[in-house]
UniProtKB/Swiss-Prot annotation:
GO terms for cellular component: cytosolic large ribosomal subunit. Gene3D superfamilies: Ribosomal protein L11, C-terminal domain, Ribosomal protein L11/L12, N-terminal domain. It comes from the Bacteria. GO terms for biological process: translation. GO terms for molecular function: large ribosomal subunit rRNA binding; structural constituent of ribosome. One or more lysine residues are methylated. This is Large ribosomal subunit protein uL11. It comes from Psychrobacter sp. (strain PRwf-1). Forms part of the ribosomal stalk which helps the ribosome interact with GTP-bound translation factors. Keywords: Methylation, Ribonucleoprotein, Ribosomal protein, RNA-binding, rRNA-binding. Part of the ribosomal stalk of the 50S ribosomal subunit. Interacts with L10 and the large rRNA to form the base of the stalk. L10 forms an elongated spine to which L12 dimers bind in a sequential fashion forming a multimeric L10(L12)X complex. InterPro entries: Ribosomal_uL11, Ribosomal_uL11_bac-typ, Ribosomal_uL11_C, Ribosomal_uL11_C_sf, Ribosomal_uL11_CS, Ribosomal_uL11_N, Ribosomal_uL11_N_sf.
């Protein structure tokens, strides 16, 4: 018989830097999960990733206080800021452009996010990421 699910927790945790401080500790503590066990498992699972990369994580908590977690790919906005070499997007994206990305850079981001995108093919996925870039005030070349 399958375990009874007690709840879900969605967090963005930096790769390799999970610790019991907020926001992780309080979120897991409310559900009665062993916080240190999660931190150790998460840090071990993200050891091969770039430290500090924000990883959206969905934690499933079961009635016996055990847990499993699913890690998604980093947010497109973070990857776009990194590719464009900027700290943050534009406050007025249609007026002020803050950086540039090429189609090759967009394709690289699509390869990273491929599992989480619902696009039918590479071109559609590139257009999706290009739209995110435009909404951040990043100029897109070649799309």
């Amino acid at each position: 018989m399958a375990k009874k699910i007690d709840g879900y927790i969605k967090l963005q945790v930096p790769a390799g830097k999970a610790n019991p401080s907020p926001p992780i500790g309080p979120a897991l503590g409310q559900k009665g999960v062993n916080i240190m066990a999660f931190c150790k498992e998460f840090n071990a699972a993200t050891a091969s990733m770039e430290p500090g990369l924000p990883i959206p994580t969905e934690i499933t908590v079961y009635a016996d206080k055990s847990f499993t977690f699913i890690m998604k790919s980093p947010p497109a906005a973070f990857l776009l800021r990194k590719a464009a070499g900027i700290a943050k997007g534009s406050g007025v994206p249609n007026t002020t452009k803050v950086g540039k990305v090429t189609r090759a850079q967009l394709e690289e981001i699509v390869q990273t996010k491929n599992a989480d995108l619902t696009a039918a093919d590479l071109d559609a996925a590139v257009r999706t990421i290009a739209g995110t870039a435009r909404s951040m005030g990043i100029d897109v070349e070649g799309v």
